[in-house]
């Protein structure tokens, strides 16, 4: 099963840098040639997508619509939960279960207002694809600590070779508290079994007061995630501050430093920290 994200326009951009005395040089062309083709249009903010066959796609629209796409035609699917659309939040990633061809199960993340506090947080769901609708919808995880802030929800989903599910939640705009506190949701990569239960070998499973689903922490807004096809490692793209984007290979229990260390600055141009590297924090 093929998996692509971020765009409905399928394209490949090839580039290469050659180290020279005066710095890297970008080559204008590399063979073979690639072309791009518009598969479907009329989707305002496509957030995630996944192939369900060689000719069919599921595509999320951030405003809260899940589309089935085939032969250039998009069909809106029914059965989604209520989506809390605010700022960067809405309907986020979608992917298929490893056994999708037999189970017809999909997983997706979305902003949810469930809970007592006002506002929302990122939630993970699964459901069975049944024609043009979703059946047996289940909420597998919901971040606690709702907030009306509209930024940094994450979110992407991937699986390891053993079938564990990984998904991301951003710091929800509370960088001074959430990312470095393993008793709080936000700024984390999570690891679950596909039924929503928590693996007992998770790094903080036996730590009192911790969120047992946490796999790594110290993240700002992980908006890209893939499993390396050869090594099986989980690679995450971190949407950082200005000048502070990162690509990280995720390790169990590791602290990726946000906001204690960063190469970035605030979008306003003011500094966040002068620290770039500290003991116990991943680069």
Regions found by a protein language model. Give the residues of each.
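Acidic, Gly/Ser/Thr-rich repeat motifs that build Ca2+-stabilized beta-propeller blades
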Residues: 21-175, 224-227, 232-240
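C-terminal motif of bacterial Sec signal peptides marking the signal peptidase cleavage site
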Residues: 15-17
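Sec-dependent signal peptide recognition
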Residues: 2-9
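Beta-propeller domain segments
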Residues: 23-26, 89-91, 101, 172-283
């Amino acid at each position: 099963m093929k998996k692509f994200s971020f765009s409905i326009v399928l394209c490949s951009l090839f580039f290469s840098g050659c180290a020279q005395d005066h710095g890297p040089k970008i080559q204008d062309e590399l063979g073979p040639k690639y072309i791009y083709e518009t598969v479907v249009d009329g989707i305002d903010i496509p957030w995630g997508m996944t192939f369900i066959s060689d000719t069919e796609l599921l595509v999320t629209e951030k405003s809260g619509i899940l589309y089935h796409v085939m032969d250039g035609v998009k069909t809106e699917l029914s059965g989604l939960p209520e989506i809390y659309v605010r700022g960067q939040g809405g309907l986020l990633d979608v992917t298929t279960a490893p056994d999708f061809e037999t189970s017809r199960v999909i997983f997706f993340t979305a902003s949810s207002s469930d809970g007592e506090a006002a506002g929302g947080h990122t939630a993970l769901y699964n459901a069975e694809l049944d024609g043009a609708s979703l059946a047996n919808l289940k909420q597998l995880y919901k971040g606690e600590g709702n907030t009306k802030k509209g930024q940094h929800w994450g979110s992407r989903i991937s699986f390891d070779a053993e079938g564990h599910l990984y998904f991301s939640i951003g710091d929800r705009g509370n960088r001074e508290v959430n990312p470095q506190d393993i008793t709080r949701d936000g700024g984390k990569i999570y690891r679950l079994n596909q039924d929503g239960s928590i693996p007992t070998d998770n790094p903080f499973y036996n730590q009192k007061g911790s969120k047992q689903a946490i796999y790594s922490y110290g993240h700002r807004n992980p908006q890209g995630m893939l499993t390396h096809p050869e090594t099986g490692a989980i690679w995450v793209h971190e949407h950082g501050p200005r000048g502070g984007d990162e690509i990280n290979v995720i390790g169990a229990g590791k602290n990726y430093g946000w906001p204690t260390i960063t190469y970035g600055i605030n979008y306003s141009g003011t500094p966040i920290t002068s620290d770039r590297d500290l003991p116990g924090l991943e680069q």
